[in-house]
Regions:
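Hydrophobic transmembrane signal anchors and adjacent membrane-proximal interface regions, especially
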Residues: 2-8, 79, 102-106, 161
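Mitochondrial intermembrane space
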Residues: 19, 37, 53-58, 65-68, ...
């Protein structure tokens, strides 16, 4: 099915994307669970945008986040769509939703997923911040630098020598 989003033209296998979005495994860490429980209600426009691509807002493939003083900063939330990008805009899609200015990037960026095909693209949302709503202790402030080094190392991305020694 051909879907147009701003200047993007996408060939979406809607049936298989919906099936995948409902069935793939999701992370059970505390910060991700905090996102799952409030994302639908907090971001109705984003939820609608994603559903038009066969995606469920509360079932992303990958989330990068860190606990700040009294909220969680979700650096990125990535989803996988079965299909292809036929035509792409050189800019992201901007959306104001849930009191936040969100950036949405559609591309062929790799995120860990359980796809059984090479024909997929990703939808990644940036700039999400959410309060802690789970009835359990707020995560301790983690060492963000160490987390970033771990993340980049995990996905075979270069890390500068100065960062490795910190």
């Amino acid at each position: 099915m051909i879907v147009r989003k701003n200047e993007f033209i996408l060939d979406v296998d809607l049936e298989n994307t919906i099936k995948y979005s409902r069935e793939h495994s999701i992370c059970n860490c505390d910060e991700d669970r905090n996102f799952y429980v409030q994302s639908k209600e907090k971001f109705p426009k984003l939820s609608k945008f994603l559903s038009e691509l066969g995606l469920l807002i509360d079932r992303p493939d990958e989330i990068g986040s860190c606990a700040e003083e009294d909220y969680i900063d979700y650096h990125f939330v990535s989803y996988t769509v079965i299909g292809d990008v036929l035509e792409a805009d050189k800019y992201e899609i901007d959306m104001f939703d849930g009191g936040l200015f969100l950036n949405i990037v559609i591309d062929h960026w790799y995120v860990p997923n359980e796809q059984k095909t090479d024909k997929y693209f990703t939808v990644t949302v940036y700039n999400i911040r959410l309060p802690w709503v789970l009835q359990e202790p707020f995560p301790e402030n983690k060492d963000t630098e160490k987390d970033l080094i771990f993340y980049f190392t995990k996905y075979n991305m270069p890390v500068s020598a100065t960062a490795k020694t910190a």
